[in-house]
Each structure stands twice: as C-alpha cells, then as structure tokens.
C-alpha cells in the first residue's frame, strides 16, 4: 500500500472513531452548539474532526472539541487538548504536551520532558523519559517516575509510588504513603518514613535513616549513625556502625550493639543483649536481663548483675563486681577489690586477690581465701575451708568446722578449735591454743603457756615443754 493510500485509510478510521465519540459523549465538553466539522487540517496530511479543532502540523490529527495539534506527527484528541511538540499525543481533556515524543493522556496532564508520559489526572512529567501516572503526580527529573497520588519524583532516575511520597535524591525509590527521601541511592517503603543521607533505607512506619548507608526497618526507629541498623520498634541509634534490633533499644556507642528489649549500648564496641541491659563503657558486655556493665571490658551475664570495674565479670543472678579484673559468679556474690573472686551464693571477696567460693563465705583481706559455707577470712594470705571457720590472723589457716584462728601463722584443723596464739596450732576437736608457739592436739586440750603443747584428751599445757632425759642417762660434767 502506498503512503498516500495508507494515510487516507488512517484518516477515514479517525473520522469514524470521532463520529462515534461525539455521538456517545455529546462532544465531551458540555453543550456544543456549533456544527461538527470533519475535514483536512491546515497541515500536510492533517485531519480535524469535531468543533473548533486545529491540526496545523504535518501528519497531525485534532479530534473532538477545541483541540490543537500544532507540531508534526502529533495528535490532540478529546477536549481542550494541546499537542505542541513533535510526535506527541494529548488525549482526553485539557492535556498539554510541550516535549517531543511525549504523551499526556487523561485530564489536565502536562509533559515537558522529551519521551515523557503523563497519564491520569493533573500529572506533570518534566524530565527526559519521565513518567507520571495517577493523580497530581510530578516527575521532574530525567528518568524519574511518579505513580499514584500526589507523588513527587524530583531527582534523576528516582521513583515515587503510592501517596504523597517525595523523592529528591538521585537514584532513590519511595513506596507507600508520605515517605520522604532527600538523598541519593536511598529507599523508603511504608508510611511516613524519612531518609536524608546517601544510601539510607527506611522501611515500615515512621522510621528515620539520617546517616549515610543507615537502615531503619520496622516502626518508629531512628538511625543517625553511618552504616548503622535499627530494626524493630522504637530503636534509637546515634553512632556509626552501631546496631539496634528489637524493641526500644539504644545504641549510642561506635560499633555498639543492642538487641532485645530496652537495652542500652553506649560504649564503643559495647554489646547489650536481652532485656533492660546496660553496657555503657568501651568494649563492655551485658547479656540477659537487667544487667549493667559500666567499665571498660566489663561483662555482666544473667539477671541483675553489675560489673562496675575494669575487666570485671559478673555471671549469674544479682552479682556485683567493683574491683578491677574481679569475678562474681553464681547468686548474690560480691567481688569488690582487685582480682577478687566470689563464686557460689552470697559470697564476699573484698580483699585484693581474695577468693570466696561456696555459700556465705567472706574473704576480706588481701590474698585471703574462703572455701565452703559461712567461712570468714580477715587475715592476709589466710585460708579457711569447711563450715563456719573464722580467721583474723595473717598467713593463718582453718580447715573443718567452726574453727577460729585469730593470730598470725597459726592453724586450726578439725572442729570447734580456737587458736589465738602466734604461730600456734590446734588439731582435733574443741582444742585451744592460746599461747604463742603452742600446740593443742586431740580432744578438749588447752595449750596456754608460751611454747606449750597439750596432746591427747583434756590436757592442759600450762608450762613450756622441756626435754627430760631418760633416768639411765648419766649427765656429763
């Protein structure tokens, strides 16, 4: 088919469609009193069909009421449309195409960008190859897209889908309702999310990604640190490389992590996992429920533990560590001095390098050790092991049950023994060594004099022991 014959056929089809259109719609413009015209337009190979139409461009068509197809290869169809650029189409009512190869279809749409499309009602496509579909959308930059109602795609290669989304950063995307993006390479999905930094992501409801490559996912999360992630409900991040996952966690230290419910990680590299934990110092850790790690390298694991000293460790329930490098493990233990250790239940290690292991033991002097139940050691370098032993002397020891040693370098082994003398010993049951350098060994013995010994059963050492030679030994002169 020759070009002229094909054009005549297309013209007849347009006239036929135009006649049908007017018969059904009453010319789409209310009461129209002028007679419809079906004729050639003023442009070469152009056609006008309807009332008050103008087809002045080459190969143009103006069909309906008060339409204008001015530029070559353009079409204006409907009512009050203007196709003012080459290869453009304005179809519907009050549409305007100002850029080549653009399309405005619907009502009140405008295209200003080459190759752009505005389809629906009151949409504007200003950018090169931009698209605005729906109602009152604007695609202002090249390769931008706005779909839905009241969306604004203001950055290059941006997309806004949904309702009242605003995207001004290049290569960014917003999906949902009232999301705002003002940075490049960002994503906002959901409702009322905000991204203001490059590479940020806010997904869910009322989230804010305020720093470069930050992520806020869920509801009411806030991420202001670079490369940070706030995921869940009401999490808050204010430092770089930090993470908050769960419900109402706060991570304010660089590279800190808060995971669970209402945890706080405010120290550099601090970690708080669980419920209501606090890791407030650099490299501190709090795991479990209501634990606190408040000094550098401190660790609190379990429930209601407090690690308040440098490199201190509190593990279990209600343990407290206030001495540097100290440890409290179990239930209700306290380690309050340098390198002190309290392990078990309700033990206290308050001396430097002290150790209290078991139940209700107290090691209150430097290098003191208490093992067992209810032992109390107040002497330096002293040790008590067993049940309810009590030591007050330095370098002393008590092993057994309810022994008491109150002087230096003394020892009590057995049950209910008492040693109050210096460098003295009581071994057995209910023995007393009250003099210095004395020994009471056996049952109910008492060594009271200096260097005295009472050995056996209910003996009294009232004088120092002396050497007595055998009677057959002849004394030398």
Across the structure, where does each feature detected by a protein language model lie?
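Bacterial Sec-dependent N-terminal signal peptides
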Residues: 1-33
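Periodic small-residue-enriched repeat registers in elongated scaffold domains
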Residues: 30-477
């Amino acid at each position: 088919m020759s070009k002229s014959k094909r054009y005549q056929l297309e013209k007849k089809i347009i006239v036929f469609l135009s006649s049908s259109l007017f018969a059904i719609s009453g010319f789409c413009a209310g009461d129209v009193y002028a007679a419809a015209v079906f004729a050639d337009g003023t442009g070469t190979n152009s056609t006008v069909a309807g009332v008050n139409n103008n087809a002045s461009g080459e190969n143009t068509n103006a069909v309906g009421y008060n339409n204008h197809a001015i530029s070559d290869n353009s079409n204006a169809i409907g009512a009050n449309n203007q196709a003012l650029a080459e290869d453009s189409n304005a179809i519907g009512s009050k549409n305007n195409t100002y850029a080549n190869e653009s399309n405005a279809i619907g009502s009140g749409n405008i295209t200003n960008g080459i190759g752009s499309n505005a389809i629906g009602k009151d949409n504007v496509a200003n950018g090169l190859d931009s698209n605005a579909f729906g109602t009152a959308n604007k695609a202002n930059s090249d390769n931008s897209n706005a779909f839905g109602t009241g969306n604004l795609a203001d950055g290059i290669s941006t997309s806004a889908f949904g309702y009242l989304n605003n995207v001004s950063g290049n290569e960014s995307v917003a999906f949902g309702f009232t999301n705002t993006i003002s940075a490049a390479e960002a994503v906002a999905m959901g409702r009322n999310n905000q991204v203001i930094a490059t590479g940020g992501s806010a997904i869910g409801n009322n989230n804010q990604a305020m720093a470069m490559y930050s992520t806020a996912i869920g509801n009411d999360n806030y991420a202001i640190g670079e490369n940070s992630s706030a995921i869940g409900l009401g999490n808050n991040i204010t430092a770089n490389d930090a993470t908050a996952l769960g419900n109402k966690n706060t991570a304010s230290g660089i590279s800190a992590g808060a995971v669970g419910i209402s945890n706080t990680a405010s120290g550099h590299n601090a970690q708080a996992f669980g419920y209501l934990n606090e890791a407030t110092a650099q490299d501190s850790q709090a795991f479990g429920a209501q634990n606190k790690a408040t000094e550098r390298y401190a660790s609190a694991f379990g429930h209601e533990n407090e690690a308040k000293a440098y490199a201190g460790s509190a593990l279990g329930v209600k343990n407290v560590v206030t001495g540097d490098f100290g440890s409290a493990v179990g239930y209700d233990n306290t380690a309050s001095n340098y390198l002190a250790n309290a392990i078990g239940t309700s033990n206290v290690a308050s001396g430097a390098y002290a150790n209290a292991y078991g139940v209700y033991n107290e090691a209150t002097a430097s290098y003191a050790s208490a093992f067992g139940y209810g032992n109390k050691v107040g002497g330096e370098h002293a040790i008590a092991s067993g049940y309810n032993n009590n030591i007050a002397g330095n370098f002393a020891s008590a092993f057994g049950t309810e022994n008491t040693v109150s002087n230096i370098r003394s020892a009590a082994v057995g049950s209910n023994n008492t040693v109050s003398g210096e460098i003295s010993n009581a071994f057995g049951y209910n023995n007393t060594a009250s003099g210095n350098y004395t020994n009471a060994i056996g049952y109910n013995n008492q060594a009271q004099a200096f260097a005295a010994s009472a050995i056996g059963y209910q003996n009294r050492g009232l004088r120092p022991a002396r050497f007595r030679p055998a009677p057959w030994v002849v004394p030398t002169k």
